[in-house]
Curated annotation (Swiss-Prot):
HAMAP family: Ile_tRNA_synth_type1
Domain of life: Bacteria
Subunit details: Monomer.
Location(s), subcellular: Cytoplasm
Organism: Mannheimia succiniciproducens (strain KCTC 0769BP / MBEL55E)
Gene name of the record: ileS
Identification of the protein by name: Isoleucine--tRNA ligase
Primary enzyme class: ligase
Annotated Zn(2+) binding sites: C905, C908, C921, C924
UniProt main location, coarse: cytoplasm
Gene Ontology molecular function, alphabetical: aminoacyl-tRNA deacylase activity; ATP binding; isoleucine-tRNA ligase activity; tRNA binding; zinc ion binding
Amino acid sequence: MVRKMSEQKDYKNTLNLPETGFPMRGDLAKREPGMLKNWYDNDLYQKIRQSSKGKKSFILHDGPPYANGSIHIGHAVNKILKDIIIKSKTALGFDSPYIPGWDCHGLPIELKVEGLVGKPNQKISAAQFREECRKYAREQVEGQKKDFIRLGVLGDWDNPYLTMNFDTEANIIRAFGKAVANGHLYKGSKPVHWCLDCASSLAEAEVEYEDRTSPSIYVRFAAADESAVENKFVLTEQGKGKLSAVIWTTTPWTLPSNKAISINPELEYQIVQFGDERFILAAELVESVAQAVGVESWKALGSAKGSDLELLQFKHPFYDYNVPFILGDHVTLDGGTGLVHTAPDHGQDDYVVARKYNIGMAGLIGNDGKFNSNAKFFAGLGVFEANGKVLEKLDEVGALLKLEKIRHSYPHCWRHKTPIIFRATPQWFIGMETQGLRQQALSEIKKVRWIPDWGQARIEKMVENRPDWCISRQRTWGVPVALFIHKETEQLHPRTLELIEEVAKLVERKGIQAWWDLDAKDLLGDDAAHYSKVPDTLDVWFDSGSTYYSVVKNRPEFNGKEADMYLEGSDQHRGWFMSSLMLSTATDNKAPYKQVLTHGFTVDGQGRKMSKSIGNIVTPQEVMDKFGGDILRLWVASTDYTGEMTVSDEILKRAADSYRRIRNTARFLLANLNGFDPKRDLVQAHEMISLDRWAVDCAFRAQAEIKEAYDNYQFHTVVQRLMKFCSVEMGSFYLDIIKDRQYTTKADSLARRSCQTALWHIAEALVRWMAPILSFTADEIWGYLPGERGEFVFTEEFYDGLFALDVSESLDDAYWQQVITVRNEVNRVLEQARNDKVIGGGLEAEVTIFANDEYSALLNKLGNELRFVTITSKAEVKTLADADVAEGEVAGLAIKAIRSANHKCPRCWHYSDSKDANSLCSRCEENVNGNGEERRFA
């Protein structure tokens, strides 16, 4: 018999109220540092390595950031993306080590150290200077390392790779030796990017383009023999006056080095009468040149094809020698005159075309960017300083046709932000055509998966157009070009490959200083008198470009396997991706990576680049101090990284809102798992209530999509699916419905344990979905989940305890989706009733659902449990024909809501058949004092 409890007023102790120590507020900025300490005190990374042992490997090779300065938001994006991939690959069942690295040699560090201790060989010896550079780089690495760790990035931070580690320096030299062995190295004088402030050559990736105002001049080159020139043209009229070829340039300082005039063999050229003079111009550019120089009328006197004009001679404007017309395909009709001033010292195209004609260099400019004595009128002047003098000289000799100013894009040094020049210097190169390197690299590009796919076309174009790679630098702090060359012939020592390995062994023991300390006699014996050590250092892009060999092939964690992925910002197509591709192809005939993923740059809320002058810089440190690392990570994951990544306070607040929804879902799950022991209380799938089985099936389907999105690096899709699951499928439907069953049924009833079983499965899955992105929060949740488990979520694979609904299940997903449609329509009507003050809350309502046959059959399956789905005190189904209200927004449904006339149960708050306001409803009487109510569906 059921005993009446109508006199009892407080029923709180009879309810299964949610309870958890998991805090409602994340307080991430305060809590995360403590979690990090726990991770490192307990050697988390090594535990992940141990748990992954023997699994299929996935190697993401870290592109080394430069060891200088604090990390910026772009660094944070890069490291977080890598960390998400490493953690998700671990969860997908891979062994995925992460060895962070740093680029430690090169000019920026030299400049910082110069500011501290002076230039090498002035106040301090070169050896001491290198030691100071090493010390400075080490300090920078430690500072950046702390910031990267604070982001929640897991890796072997105690054993990173540094390009200045002795073993790495030695292996860089060995990679150089392999390139030499394969015949890719040569020495030559070629025009290279030259920074006057650095007094050194620059790599392509160290060049930035900024707008600059330059002189724009048209210059006459008088014909050396007018009749010889005229004879090559088909003339319709002789014309009158002096005959000149006209060139256009924005670099007057290069004119002293002019050695030729390039024309296109396929273009038509004309002799044109401009006033009292005759000019040779490309036929299609005559009109634009006339406008530029202020000539209103002109007359074409004759024409000729470019190929017919080869080797015609013209006088240099101010030196006593002639320059020839030479043929070059680089001459276009994009601007100018169709005749290109050619100075092989100062332009790549100029150098290539002049070489075909055996035209040598002028050699007028020294390392300091000043003209030498051979430049005569301009001796001692800096190149840009000389611009004015050249213009004066041109005007003096009558060669200056027109002078204007032009604003145009011009190459600048990435470090000094000052304009650079092209300058021919003796350097060491890896030849793009040597041994077919260019074609082999292009072939390898096609074997790589590029993410996004436009990356392939981008790097292909760069490889097609790039010049030979100048790998030598005239610096102090860098890996040496470890070669001995003959003092007279400049030929390499016949034992070069053997000597390179000997040097590598020395460097392995003592670092790069061993090269400069080395007495050539120690390796060469009597040969030392005839050979000298090369004083140059390797381009730092060679350092980082060779890490596929110096690190990936030599770290035991990688087991000699090649990298599966390189991941960097989109500027690295011409940087690290390029240098790595060229070197790996030169040494191993294959690309060093299977996949290359690039992310865009960060911009502010208005789409502007981060800039100190604008004052719009968002630093990761500020974000973490204000919001916490997980919010920064969630922003990165939820942003489509294939384009520009917009970050602002407003956007981060939106990320924080999304975070709260996820956290609240997790907290609800944990609070309702109070008292649940999976070993004791777990309900088998076939015994679970229908709605609970559906919820697990929902998680099963979500997990399949989330795993696929992680596997395809679509992290914004992961976040969207996570949000949909938490907010829509769970939050606005399932979790809302189960509250009554969870709180009011008997604590150990099937109805409640079935629900808790579903919640437990969902929580086990959810925490793993979150872990790669919301690492701190996932770790926190992990500590509150019931049941035996490993110490950290990061050693786990995705949860395998979810299940799909059986195909024979009549209440399948399609069924519940239709129920959701009905419930949404009921909610719309209830909301209107609330607005009309008919009811307060939904439990005050009784609803009648007038439904067509399809919906009637659907809803009647739930029987008396329909009211638990609508969360009303009563819900009954009648035929649509009996409706006394109009159909609503869903065809086939008409909903009527009235205020219940019954008493409110003081325990479950449903309005029912209790005799008065203090009496329990019959359902609660059964749950408190009887055997408990039964549920089958909801």
